[in-house]
Every structure is written in structure tokens, then in C-alpha cells.
A protein has these predicted regions:
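Glycine/Thr-rich beta-alpha phosphate-binding loop at enzyme active sites
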Residues: 78-85, 105-148, 152
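Active-site-adjacent beta->alpha loops and helix N-cap segments on the catalytic face
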Residues: 42-55, 84-99, 112, 133-148
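Glycine-rich beta-to-alpha transition loops that act as phosphate-gripper elements at the mouths
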Residues: 14-15, 66-72, 87-88, 106-114, ...
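Catalytic beta/alpha-barrel core
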Residues: 35-44, 62-91, 102-113, 126
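Active-site mouth loops of central-metabolism enzymes
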Residues: 6-20, 105
Length: 194
């Protein structure tokens, strides 16, 4: 099985970035990655909007898909139509609000959430965490069988998240995933993002 950058969604986390964040985003934007999810959970809405404006400029220049995260108001203010949401936020949006997004993703942690996300109009989902990860220390991964069950239950692309690396990306693809998510700031993935 051939794995390429187009199988990878890069998820930002400035705190993991070992180099200038904007330089890192520029490098990733020049790759063939499927996209960049601008996560940055620690920022206020105003801070997130300021960052999003800069990142969107970089991504648009390189023709890289950027997906905003959580802040639906920022997406509206910027007239931007791609967002990734936690399920609790997705559930609060009206059909009209959901339909305003051309790309609508959700973070799913169960088979039921995956089916619900698809029924709510998501165009893709992330499912996890699949493997043990530093982000969820002490919690065992849900495993490849969990991922396979989700991939079989929905007709939209599923991206595995949690502990995804070059050694296991083939395994998640074989389970039916469209690809995997990696933290784009992690220095251990330099070879994937350059």
C-alpha cells in the first residue's frame, strides 16, 4: 500500500512546534497533505480569528485546504466555509448553519457519534483515539477494530486520530480510513511535512 501526504490531515498545536509556527505552516502548506486543521484550543475567539487570518493567507497562497476548528463565529466573520467541530458544538447548530459549510468535520469517539455526525451533514469525521498517545496519557487507544467498525458504518471519509505515525498509517488505511491525522507541530514528523 502506497501512503502519501494526501492521506494526512495535519492538526495544529503551537505548543508542540519546535520552530516558528508560521514557518512550519508554510512548510506544511507546500506539501501534498490533505489539509491543515487549525485547532489551537487555548485561544480566545478574538485571538483565534487573528491567527486564522494569517494562516488562511498562507494556505490560500499555497492552495492548501485549511479547516478552522470550533469557532463557528470566526468562520462566519471570515466568510469561510470549512470547519471541524467537537460533537457537542455540532449538535447545537441548526441545519441552515451546518449547510453553510462546504467542508464540515467532527471529532467522533464512538460508533454512535460517527453515525450521528454523518446524519448531521458532516462531509468527513475524525475517529479516535486509535493508538495510545501523549495527548491522552494513560488511556489505551480504542484500536483498529473500533476504527474499522466506524468506517463500515458511515459513507463519508474517516480520518484516524491519536498516535498516528508512519509505522501505523498503513494499518488504519487497511481498516478503511481515508487517512490519518498528525499533530503538525511535532518535530518527530518533520520528514512527513517537508
Amino acid at each position: 500500500m502506497i501512503i502519501s501526504m494526501s492521506d494526512i490531515l495535519c492538526v495544529t498545536n503551537r505548543s508542540l512546534c519546535k520552530e516558528d509556527f508560521f514557518v512550519r505552516i508554510e512548510k506544511i502548506a507546500k506539501t501534498e497533505a490533505a489539509g491543515i486543521i487549525l485547532r489551537e484550543k487555548d485561544l480566545s475567539e478574538e485571538e483565534y480569528q487573528a491567527l486564522a487570518e494569517k494562516i488562511l493567507t498562507i494556505c490560500q497562497k499555497q492552495k492548501m485546504q485549511c479547516i478552522l476548528h470550533t469557532h463557528t463565529n470566526v468562520a462566519r466573520k471570515l466568510a469561510y466555509n470549512a470547519i471541524h467541530l467537537p460533537m457537542p458544538i455540532l449538535r447545537t447548530l441548526s441545519k441552515e448553519e451546518r449547510d453553510a459549510f462546504q467542508i464540515l468535520g467532527a471529532s467522533c469517539h464512538s460508533l454512535e457519534e460517527a453515525v450521528e455526525a454523518e446524519n448531521l451533514g458532516c462531509t468527513y469525521i475524525t475517529a479516535g483515539h486509535i493508538y495510545e498517545t501523549d495527548c491522552k496519557k494513560g488511556l489505551p487507544g480504542r484500536g483498529v477494530e473500533f476504527l474499522r467498525n466506524i468506517c463500515e458504518a458511515v459513507s463519508i471519509p474517516v480520518y484516524a486520530i491519536g498516535g498516528i505515525n508512519p509505522e501505523n498509517i498503513c494499518e488504519v488505511k487497511k481498516a478503511g480510513a481515508a487517512g490519518g491525522c498528525i499533530m503538525s507541530g511535532s518535530v518527530s514528523y518533520t520528514h512527513l511535512t517537508l
